[in-house]
């Protein structure tokens, strides 16, 4: 650039604003151009441009291709019998929720004591501070 041009640069002049605007538009176009090419796949793709793509092995999900496990018929019969005896031995609906809680060690049906005092009053009375007697200045 010419030194005289730098000295006479005035941002208020229309021709100078136009030059700045055109330069900014040119920068924006050059920044958008690589994005339009579709080469923004990844950061390391430029390193592998000349090399052939690696071949991937086809993986099959085992759960879809695996056949169900074959159980011998005598083992299936024993399993069915044990399930039926377990179901028949269990009493149906004989235990109440209170009995099951008591068997676990809890007390589900025990009444809960509810205090009529507010928590703030209880704390004030425990401290012996103002508000415990209800009269200020005693």
Swiss-Prot record:
GO cellular component, one term: spliceosomal complex
Disordered: annotated span: 28-138
GO term, biological process aspect, one: RNA splicing
Biased composition (Basic residues): 56-70
Function, in words: Involved in pre-mRNA splicing.
Subcellular location per the Swiss-Prot or TrEMBL entry: Nucleus
Entry similarity comment: Belongs to the CWC25 family.
Swiss-Prot/TrEMBL keywords: mRNA processing, mRNA splicing, Nucleus, Spliceosome
Top-rank taxon: Eukaryota
Quaternary context: Associated with the spliceosome.
Protein name (record): Pre-mRNA-splicing factor CWC25
Encoding gene, per UniProt annotation: CWC25
